[in-house]
Amino acid sequence: MRYPREALATLARYGVRYHGWAANAAAPAIFARHLATVHVPRRYYTQLLPGIPTIRVFEALACGIPLVSAPWEDSEHLFRPGQDFLFARDGAEMTRHLRAISADPALRASLVQSGLETVRARHSCAHRAQELMRIVETLNPAAQPHLARIVA
């Protein structure tokens, strides 16, 4: 994410080291260097698009890194909070979760295993392609040739 100067100054005041924007393709290498990652969804996603997780949740779990997230509504029950990742309702709980992950290799392994299991079972690219094709099949048959050109 790209932040305005004012936001970067606020982060610095709180001791947060911002290393700059990274392309999605770089996420696996970045995640591989750390014990856990934190997800704080933007207000846009939590208020205007409630129930829809950001791509970060999928990326982190697919990359096999323990995830601690600020709250967001999982209205479709895509993931298993407390098993695939941990929710933190406030800064103190975030700190507790991160300390627990840091100190407990079994907790880290369990979160990684569960997160990967959920992604592999329900959220792979193949799953999304199959889902898209099911949607296309339900559309007006007259529209299917046009859609076939778009999908191809």
Question: Residues of each region from the PLM?
Answer:
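Residue-level signal for the nucleotide or nucleotide-sugar donor/cofactor binding architecture
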Residues: I55, R89, H123
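Nucleotide-sugar donor-binding catalytic core of glycosyltransferases
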Residues: M1-A62, P66, W72-L78
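C-terminal amphipathic helix plus adjacent low-complexity
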Residues: T95-A152
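Hydrophobic, well-ordered secondary-structure elements that form the walls
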Residues: A60, F85, S124
